[in-house]
Amino acid sequence: PGVTGPVAVADAFATTWSRGAAFDLRRGMAMMVFELRQVRRPTGVSGQPRWARPEEVDLLADWVDAFNVEVHQTPRPSLEQVRERVLERIHSQNVLVWEDEGRPVSLASRSRPSPRGTAINCVRTPPAYRRRGYASACVAELSQRTLDDGKLFCTLFTDLANPTSNHIYGEIGFESRGEFVELHFD
């Protein structure tokens, strides 16, 4: 159990919740929440975007599972649970793949739609394909498609300890809106 939210709110909740309790409070990931209202697409990135296909579910589920490991997802869903979620998102056109030379090289998905916005999440480029701009191009394209669908904005959470991703998302047009924190009750 735990809480995730804006730093001041999460800290206040944790302090109140833990009064007289027999558990330790552990800080998890420090995050930045970003908002995008206008996309700046990267240039010079090889490949093209497309919606993920059902026959790719096993490959993409492996990528999402690896993403969950990298971000220390707690609790971590089973690979079968990941596969089911990925397939649901594929069928609802919520997983975008960046493809280069006929093969998927990056993915980004979207979730938590509201009347005005949608969250971009689970951005993953396998290590062999990193540092080529694929993730930036994929996120920019998915964000633009989301805006084209009538949403006013996209949101995205990043790990504050990863300056590379924070910089990349800023280049695409995401603007920081505040720090969030995960707090765990052990």
Residue ranges and their predicted role:
Residues L107, R177-E179:
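Residue-level detector of high-confidence beta-strand sites
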Residues T4-A10, L156-N166, L183-D186:
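Conserved beta-strand-loop-alpha-helix junction that forms the acyl-donor binding cleft
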Residues P6, L60, I120:
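Residue-level signal for inorganic ion chemistry
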Residues P1-S46, L183:
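Acyl-donor-binding surface of acyltransferase catalytic domains
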Residues N121-P127, R131-D148, N166-E171:
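Conserved acetyl-CoA-binding loop-helix of GNAT-fold acetyltransferases
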Residues T74-R124:
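A conserved beta-strand-loop-helix scaffold within acyl/acetyltransferase catalytic domains
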Residues P1, T15-T16, A137-F153, E175:
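Conserved acyl-CoA
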Residues V39-R76:
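Short amphipathic alpha-helix that is part of the acyltransferase structural core
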